[in-house]
Amino acid sequence: MRTILDRVKPAEHGVIVRTAAENATEHELQTDMSRLLDLWEDIKERSKKANGPTLLYREPSLAVRVIREEFNSDYRGIIIDDPELFDEIHQYIGDFNPEFSDRIEFHDTQAEGLSLFEKQHVHEQIHKALDTKVWLPSGGSLVIEHTEALTVIDVNTGKNIGKTNLEETVFSNNLEAADEIARQLRLRDIGGIIVIDFIDMDIRENRRKVLERFKDALSRDKTRTQVFEISELGLVEMTRKRIGEGLLTNFADTCPTCEGRGIMVDHSMLD
């Protein structure tokens, strides 16, 4: 990457390369560099013409910055319900990622008769993301609990009790849990120390496979994570860089009755 950059950038300039560029071709880097150099020349020209303090350049809108940072071939598309924002993003994608132009879709609320959030069941998904319990495809579940010090995720078989081999049932359930936990960490923006209680497995190779599956699922997470080996008790300790406050903090308040304890003490038993 450094060799390519030395070829495409002028010696008097420096660049910061984002992680998303690790698989970029030399042509793509050259195109992006040319765009940035044109932008810089435009800024310099504006500076020369300015007679006093003036705005020379500003970052694009938040929506465009999110598209720039996050949108890639992994996404099926972007749906926008604001006409001006749709035009802005469609123009941006057309300029810098024209191969993705057909993935930008406009949602006409008036014509559809439903808001974008209603049609895409966004509110429903947010409610699910705030629940402590998450169901797995085979009938097992996750229970996600937050404490002051860390987040605990408990894996349960639930309805998935299997019909023959208990070890295979537990192994299969843990594999599903590994995928879903990685998804929930991103969806809920959970950071800090996280302890995962996978269901106990007797076969060491199964433990290794579950941990590898979990690490592979986490590899799609742009937020830095560190995962430690699974213990004899089936516990996995990990850390995830805390970027924001998390979904729960943004959408919930501490219960004024129990003050966040989740229980009510029966004081009549103490009298």
Q: Model regions: which residues?
A:
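OB-fold/S1-family RNA-binding modules
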Residues: 1-142, 147-148, 250-271
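Conserved glycine-centered short motifs in functionally critical loops
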Residues: 9, 15, 36, 136-271
